[in-house]
A protein has these predicted regions:
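A short amphipathic helical element positioned immediately N-terminal to and/or at the very start
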Residues: 19-29, 82-85, 89, 93, ...
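N-terminal signal-anchor/first transmembrane alpha helix
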Residues: 11-61, 136-139
């Protein structure tokens, strides 16, 4: 008998391993997704190592050294401005690396929070059904009919102008200040921008989660769990959410590009994170007036936005293809 059990276990293990291999093989066949993953890994590595690879503090100003060309030597005669300096003499490479840290943190945090809220709302709405489902989903659909960017601009304008009057938990600002290496007063803006992005980011995720719940709750295994006395919470945690993992991963990977663009757009228009805290959006905004005299400034600050948004989309496409059970090997 023990030998029979061992043989059964040995036969089951390759199935699990082979499923992982199948998913990995599907993803690796998507050449653009693989290349994009390497691009994102490089940008994330730069963001993590920003304090190490940046020769200057991103907010330090060298008076009289504004608009230095890439490769110029700093005032101390030792350190080099690899990408030159900006309009007031701040090292551009240092600001780009720290901006990567901030912009990516905003996008990832907003996406994670949106997925969590979307899972909670979608699970409750789909599982309870009836009046609760009708009211919640009509509200979600109404909010989705509103153009998001104009509304985000209005909300951001009101929030940024009145940020002193908005209570933000000190633990959040201190954590963001520590993570992003910025002042706590500047971290308040980061927290508020994340909250603004999340306010609309969870809507699509909630609809996706509701669809999964409506499909799974009528399945035989769900009815069996209910008949055995499993609580509603246990059914949601053990059946609904696990079945939503794959579509949620795809949605999150595709949604990150949107958050990158929205954050950059808000900062570019002066309604997001404010200078001197560097983000790709506010750096591009400051550089646009000097597009012809100093073309490297908008080029350097705009390229990461383009690369990240494109790379996240390609990775999302690759993940979707890899997790699609209908796709042939």
């Amino acid at each position: 008998m023990p030998r029979a059990i061992d043989l059964a276990a040995a036969e089951a293990m390759p199935e699990e391993v082979s499923q992982v291999r199948v998913i990995l093989r599907r993803f690796l066949r998507h050449k653009l997704a693989v290349a994009s993953l390497f691009v994102l890994a490089a940008i994330v590595l730069i963001a993590i190592l920003a304090p190490v690879i940046s020769p200057f503090d991103p907010t330090d100003i060298e008076v009289g050294n504004d608009f230095l060309a890439p490769g110029s030597v700093g005032r101390d005669g030792v350190r080099i401005h690899y990408l030159g300096t900006d309009t007031i003499g701040r090292d551009y490479w240092s600001r780009i690396t720290y901006a990567a840290r901030i912009s990516l943190t905003v996008a990832v945090t907003a996406q994670v929070a949106s997925v969590i809220i979307g899972i909670l709302v979608g699970s409750i709405s789909g599982y309870l059904g009836g009046t609760v489902d009708a009211v919640v989903m009509r509200g979600v659909e109404f909010m989705l009919t509103i153009p998001q960017l104009p509304l985000l601009l209005i909300i951001s304008s009101l929030v940024i102008q009145n940020q002193e009057a908005i209570p933000v938990p000190e633990v959040l600002t201190n954590f963001m200040a520590w993570l992003l290496l910025i002042q706590p007063r500047d971290a308040v803006q980061v927290v508020l921008i994340i909250a603004i992005l999340v306010s609309f980011g969870w809507l699509q995720d909630s609809r996706l989660m509701r669809g999964v719940v409506l499909s799974v709750k009528e399945q035989t295994f769900t009815e069996a769990s209910r008949a055995l006395g499993a609580s509603d919470l246990r059914i949601i945690l053990s059946h609904m959410i696990p079945n939503a993992i794959a579509p949620m991963i795809v949605s999150a990977s595709l949604g990150l590009s949107g958050f990158i663009i929205y954050e950059a757009a808000l900062s570019f228009l002066g309604l997001g994170i404010q200078d001197p805290t560097p983000t790709w959006g506010n750096m591009l905004s400051a550089a646009q007036s000097f597009m012809f005299q100093h073309p490297w400034l908008p080029l350097v600050s705009g390229t990461p936005i383009f690369l990240c948004s494109l790379a996240f989309n390609f990775v999302g496409d690759g993940v979707r293809d890899a997790l699609d059970p209908r796709l042939k090997l």
